Structure formats: structure tokens, C-alpha cells
Amino acid sequence: MIKKLMPASTPSLPLWVSTNATSLSRRVGILTTLALIVVLSCSTKSFAQDQPTIAKDSVQVTAFTLSSYKGDFKIFSWVPRLHLRVNGPIASGSQIYAEFTVPGGGAWKFDCKTQETGAGHWWQPDECGGRDALGEDKGITYTGPVNFTIKMRNELMGGDVTLFTGKFKVAKIHSNETGPNYVNHFVYYVDQDWNLPIGYVFLEPDDVYQWKKPTLSFAFWARTELNGPFEPHLFHGGKEVGKMMYEGEESGKAGCGMNEIEDNPTHGTEPHGQFIWTRMRCSFPNIKAWNQTGEGNQTMFGSLYLLSENPGDYEIKILYKGHLVRSIKFGVDADGKITDNRIATNNKLGNNRVIVPVQVLGDADGQWDKNAWKTDAFYGNPLAGFTGPP
């Protein structure tokens, strides 16, 4: 009998080939069984290891107020609504879905639109849940803590995994309607105060030169109905920087022109505007991280301010209606990059933003819970390594 050592498809399982027919049959049967076990094991591990992640800063849970409760239009009720962003890979056949539970047995379960997405990319459905997905008959009048999970099932691969587990508090306030028929018209909302001390500083590609001359930008939260612009100012070494003047007026003025997220009640409330949380994105057009275009920094209105030429500590001060309402501090390295504190990376946010503490000043936001970020941040998933402002 002659034996030969042959390479196998699974390196950890060397294959001995025998010229004896009986022995050969026995060995092939054993190896086939072992190979099947390995394949199934690898498939299960692959599904678990290659699963997507939920970007924490994208998850927004709101209460969608319904105009009836069990067919009674004199009573309002609510159902959950969810926004999220999923970092790939999302395998073919995957389905993202969410489950919400309340004490006493109330529950909702609904799918989120899902698309196959490669690693290094992300998928963001418009929204999940709400009235359109759940219907008027699924509303409840409960207020208090609610638990939820975001999961992914894949019937092609035979797996079901939990991607995110969270909790939040639902409260209610009376609508702006008056009269005996509206006594039980309560508008429901999710308390989002934990957002206020958490901000983001980042670079964005220039409209023309892209990453050869990126712009300094940031995002922050406010709790108020916006009745005027927020005015950001950047300071370095105690002096304001990035200002250009032309014929007595500022050119390239910094501003907060885009609302990234708006958490608004679905109905009007009294007092009005008290339960509106908004995340705004702001930018400094005259402030660039670096200039690798081969062109100079001089413009017809003045010279661009480069972070790469001015590393160190910076502070963003924000005015609202003439009053100082925010202070955001961050650092810049010698290359002009935002000093990375690794909070965003370690918490798998999946973007290039640096998370920074935001000091809330004044009373423009009304009364809010200054300690909510410690326990309620990202719906019971506080950021590892983050410390709020004093």
C-alpha cells in the first residue's frame, strides 16, 4: 500500500490518499463530514464577524403622535419612529428590523428598508416605523421608559443578530387645542436632552478642490424653535481668526445653514417650540485645513486662514440673538487635522468626525436636564471615553 500526502482545500485538515478502495472510501466519508462541519462553522462565524454596525450618532427615536386611540378621536396616542445609518457590509438577503417593548406587554415590530452594501460604505433608509408602517390602530397612551433593539436577519445565511440595544423615555404635553373635546389631546415626545453637550468637529471637501483644500465644519444641538441665525466665531490664542472684510462688510461669513436632524413633535404644543431638538451643521468658509492646490492663499477679499500653519488649541463661540450660547474647544495638529481623541473611532461611528464636549451657556434652550448625557446618551449607550463639560 502506497500513501501520498496531498494538499487539501482546508489547510488544517491534511488529506492522506490510500490505494486501498475500502480504506479510501472510509477516509473520504470521514473527510466529507469534517469538511461539512468546517463549512457550516465558517458560515456561522462569517455572518457574526462580518455583520454591519449601527452608527450611534445616527440613531434617532421619536414618538409619532396619532390623532386617535382605538378609533376614538378625542384621545391621541403614539407609535415609535426610527432613523438610523448602518455601516456596511450588509450582505445580500439581509433585513434590518426593530422591536420596541413597553412595560405591561405592549410591543411593536417593523422592518426598515435594507439594501446590500459593501464594507467601507453605509446605508441610511429614510425612516422606519411611524404611522405609515404601523397604522393608526397600533397607538398607545403609555408614557415612561421604552426598550428597543435593532436587529438584522438573513434567511439566505440562516442568521439573526442584534446590532443595537437601547432605551428612551416618552413623555407628553397638551396640544395647543382648547375645548372639552380636546382634553385628552396630548402630544407625545421623546426626551432628547442628552444630545446638547455632544458636538462634532470635522473637515469637509472644498466645492472645487475637494480634499486639497478642505473646510473646517462642526455640528451641535439646540433645544428651541429657531427664530434667528446662530453665529459661530473661531478663536485661536485668544484672538478671533478667519475674518475677511470687503468694502466694510464681512466676506465668507461663517454660518449654520443646514439642519442635519430635526426632532419635532408631529402636532403643535402649548407652550410652542419647547420640545424641538435640532442638530445643525456649521462651516467656516475662510478657514481651510491646508492648501495643496499649488495656488496661493490670497483671495480678492483677503488671505485664507490655514489650520496647518496654526496648530494648537481652538475654541468656537456661538452667538444667538446677540448672546453667547455655546463654547466648543478642540485641537489641531501640525498637519492641519483635528486632534483625534479616538472617541468616535472607539465607538464605531463610521465617519471622520471628532466628538467634542459642548458647553451650553445662557437660557436660550430653556430648562433641560444637564445630566442626561451620563445615562441616556445614544439611548442608553453612552460614549466610551466621553466626558461632558463642567
Residue ranges and their predicted role:
Residues L31-S41:
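Bacterial N-terminal signal peptides
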